Amino acid sequence: MLCRAACSTGRRLGPVAGAAGSRHKHSLPDLPYDYGALEPHINAQIMQLHHSKHHAAYVNNLNATEEKYHEALAKGDVTTQVALQPALKFNGGGHINHTIFWTNLSPKGGGEPKGELLEAIKRDFGSFEKFKEKLTAVSVGVQGSGWGWLGFNKEQGRLQIAACSNQDPLQGTTGLIPLLGIDVWEHAYYLQYKNVRPDYLKAIWNVINWENVTERYTACKK
């Protein structure tokens, strides 16, 4: 379900969806834990601002942009439709990425995955530690704002690591199905870790929800 949900969310964000009839309105998802639940690794102030301000802004701007798009679509205004594409990508990607991100985290997270996901990580990266090192390095190395991702290549049946700039969604950008995302925008860590992104990356491994990542992996293999 998680894989299908991610894919269907991406389709709903497409400009043609809902052109006829009532238009789907996106909403801010509730967190599955309290704002302070991830402390001391990610503090409550960051979580509150990140969720209730930043993610909410992506949702609101996405709805507003889609409204303008559908008005332009109804008028046959192709120029406006094209002009709105960057805003659809940015705000739609922000909504997709953060919706995955919140479920990728848990106050009971950390440690290592189990079962077939762990075996796949060992197969594709050599060991769990090598995987952590690579995803950490890719995430730390993002220039400016963006995301580090563990994704599933459906065609090859293998796990891959990738980085996306700004709010570019992983699947729409690379074709990889998102399993685990690490937000490296400064708003995700600056209030606690200042400009030391590597310290934030070191801390976030303590709250990774491997059960959620495993569910996504299992669903996407079907």
UniProtKB/Swiss-Prot annotation:
Compartmental location: Mitochondrion matrix
Catalyzed chemical reaction(s): 2 superoxide + 2 H(+) = H2O2 + O2
Up-regulation conditions: Expression is regulated by KRIT1.
Co-factor binding details: Binds 1 Mn(2+) ion per subunit.
Keywords in alphabetical order: Acetylation, Manganese, Metal-binding, Mitochondrion, Nitration, Oxidoreductase, Transit peptide, Ubl conjugation
Post-translational modification: Nitrated under oxidative stress. Nitration coupled with oxidation inhibits the catalytic activity.
Name recorded for this polypeptide: Superoxide dismutase [Mn], mitochondrial
Source taxonomy: Eukaryota, Metazoa, Chordata, Craniata, Vertebrata
